Each structure stands twice: as structure tokens, then as C-alpha cells.
């Protein structure tokens, strides 16, 4: 009797929490982020995490090395996105990582070493991409895994507010006028 081990690989949906302090939808999106042209997510990494990206597929090695050589940068935008509850420790140097979900021209995407076919481009719109930037350096570009170019985010609002995707939370609702 011979036993066989079979390995199956499949893509399954996953859900993650992203702080509202790290979410930047297109300001013109109204109350639905999917009506916007782009969505930007902010994250932070320490030097080891950035260094580990050098060997990861899809990352532009030279760009990651350039980000490491530049070191963690504190820009005015990055200081604006820092949530009040986050550590203000300046010794804990962190790299600011930005993920851009949106559309770019095919030529621009290919200039970032992303292989895309002519049929990846949506007519009069562009190529749906995800661009990863560390500090201000693009380090990775790939085709958005969502077939229609949608953003992989949904907001849960306790109470909707016209013109805002964030809505109003419970604390605001129970506040006296």
C-alpha cells in the first residue's frame, strides 16, 4: 500500500484590518471608495522588513537598495498620517510604505519592470495596478489582482454620511449636541 501526498495550491479570500488613519481614498469618491480613481494605503516597516524585500519576487532590487541607503524619511505627509495612539519614539526609525491602487498608462507600468500584456489595459482608463513605494521610491509594480480593477477595501460605517466614505462612529452618534 503506497501513500501519496498531494499538495493543493489555491487562492482564498482573506480579511485584514487597516486603520482608518492609514486609508486615503480619492477625495472625489463621495461616500463610496469604489467611485474614486485611486486608493492609497499607508504602512510602516523597519529596516529588516525592507531588506527582506530584496529577495522577494516582483520587487525592484535596485530601488529597494536605494530606499535602504536613503534611510527612513520623515516627510510632512507622513507626520500627518501618524495616528495619535502610535509611538512618537524617534529612535524607532520606520520606513513609510505607500500602496497605490489605481490606473496608470501601460508604458509607465512597464517602465517599473512590471510585465503587462496589451489586453491588461482597459480602454480609455489604463492598466489597473498596485504600486508599492518606500519613502518616495517606487519599489514594486504589479497588475491589480482584482479582475475589474476594484480596490481590495471595504469600509464598515455605523452610520453613513453623505459625501464621506468613513461615516460616523458610535462615539459621535451619542455625543450631545
Question: Which role does the model predict for each range below?
Answer:
Residues 1-177:
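Extended alpha-helical, oligomerization-prone segments that build pores/tubes and scaffolds
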Amino acid at each position: 500500500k503506497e501513500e501519496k501526498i498531494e499538495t493543493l495550491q489555491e487562492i482564498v479570500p482573506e480579511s485584514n484590518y487597516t486603520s482608518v488613519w492609514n486609508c486615503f481614498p480619492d477625495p472625489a469618491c463621495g461616500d463610496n471608495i469604489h467611485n474614486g480613481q485611486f486608493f492609497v494605503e499607508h504602512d510602516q516597516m523597519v529596516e529588516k522588513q525592507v531588506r527582506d524585500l530584496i529577495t522577494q519576487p516582483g520587487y525592484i532590487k535596485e530601488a529597494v537598495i536605494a530606499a535602504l541607503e536613503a534611510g527612513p524619511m520623515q516627510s510632512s505627509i507622513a507626520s500627518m498620517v501618524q495616528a495619535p495612539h502610535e509611538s512618537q519614539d524617534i529612535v524607532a526609525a520606520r520606513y513609510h510604505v505607500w500602496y497605490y491602487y489605481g490606473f496608470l498608462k501601460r508604458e509607465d507600468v512597464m517602465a517599473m519592470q512590471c510585465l503587462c500584456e496589451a489586453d491588461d489595459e482597459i480602454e480609455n482608463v489604463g492598466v489597473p495596478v498596485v504600486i508599492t513605494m518606500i519613502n518616495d521610491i517606487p519599489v514594486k509594480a504589479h497588475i491589480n489582482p482584482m479582475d475589474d480593477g476594484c480596490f481590495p477595501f471595504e469600509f464598515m460605517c455605523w452610520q453613513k454620511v453623505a459625501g464621506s466614505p468613513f461615516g460616523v462612529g458610535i462615539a459621535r452618534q451619542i455625543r450631545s449636541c
